[in-house]
Amino acid sequence: MTLHRFKKIALLSALGIAAISMNVQAAERIAFIPKLVGVGFFTSGGNGAQQAGKELGVDVTYDGPTEPSVSGQVQLINNFVNQGYNAIIVSAVSPDGLCPALKRAMQRGVRVLTWDSDTKPECRSYYINQGTPAQLGGMLVDMAARQVNKDKAKVAFFYSSPTVTDQNQWVKEAKAKIAKEHPGWEIVTTQFGYNDATKSLQTAEGILKAYSDLDAIIAPDANALPAAAQAAENLKNDKVAIVGFSTPNVMRPYVERGTVKEFGLWDVVQQGKISVYVADALLKKGSMKTGDKLDIQGVGQVEVSPNSVQGYDYEADGNGIVLLPERVIFNKENIGKYDF
């Protein structure tokens, strides 16, 4: 082999290796983080995110802490940033606790989005939102009103924690709607299960024992709602209306037995899918602005809205909210159509 030919082959080999290296580096990697693992709601969202990854040809990793904590989520965020992930999508356990880590991630060029539960808007680019507080808070009250159907009633609120962003926004709107439209309803207690199945069941049983004449439990949380239903069955209380948000697969037996007449949610699989599609669009296009639309396979079209739809004052370029197209009320007639 001549020296010239050897150099040519060596150069081509080096170029080939460089091209392969560039392709590896260019492959998108997206982290999808729940509040905690082991809960059906978050698993379903992760399934939707990973389905979107397959459709788009991007690598989506689903991982979260075993308990809902700021420190657990911060550790994961930092790990994903250090591993070179291009985008992070997180369901935040706190509106501000994750902000230092997320802002550092953005400074390093990582796209940061939220889903399910938001941070302060300045700590992310876009929030993939299941519904506005007014929509979801109103949904909770309307479901309860259809069953309580009386002017004077006693109502309890029961959900995950006093600090979680999304549920507290919904409950604030729900309580305002009760004050305006059902002034005879008395909110006798607001209690928390802290995303723990055992504690949630104990808390729900405690509510029912303490307020034997309770008319409704409003439980907008994937752990609290089934816990309230199970508590009612354990205590043989068939008079209290139990409404809230959880997944159809978890709530199916309670609906079939008549313990829960109706409950609500949104398609969390779609929410996970939309989140990854939006992150992918940002990585490819660089930015999106209010009014921009995005077509999502199997879902339809979504649009970027201003942060004001969530009641925020903060607005900035490359920052906004993407609302899910619809929310669902599940009952005995339609629950069989859903599997998540």
Swiss-Prot record:
One of its GO terms (molecular function) is carbohydrate binding. Pfam families: Peripla_BP_4 (PF13407). Residues 1-26 form the signal peptide. InterPro entries: Bact_Solute-Bind_Prot2, LsrB, Peripla_BP_I, SBP_2_dom. Keywords: Periplasm, Signal. It is found in: Periplasm. GO terms for cellular component: ATP-binding cassette (ABC) transporter complex; outer membrane-bounded periplasmic space. CDD domains: PBP1_LsrB_Quorum_Sensing (cd20003). It comes from the Bacteria. GO terms for biological process: transmembrane transport. Part of the ABC transporter complex LsrABCD involved in autoinducer 2 (AI-2) import. Binds AI-2 and delivers it to the LsrC and LsrD permeases. Belongs to the bacterial solute-binding protein 2 family. The complex is composed of two ATP-binding proteins (LsrA), two transmembrane proteins (LsrC and LsrD) and a solute-binding protein (LsrB). This is Autoinducer 2-binding protein LsrB. It comes from Escherichia coli O157:H7.
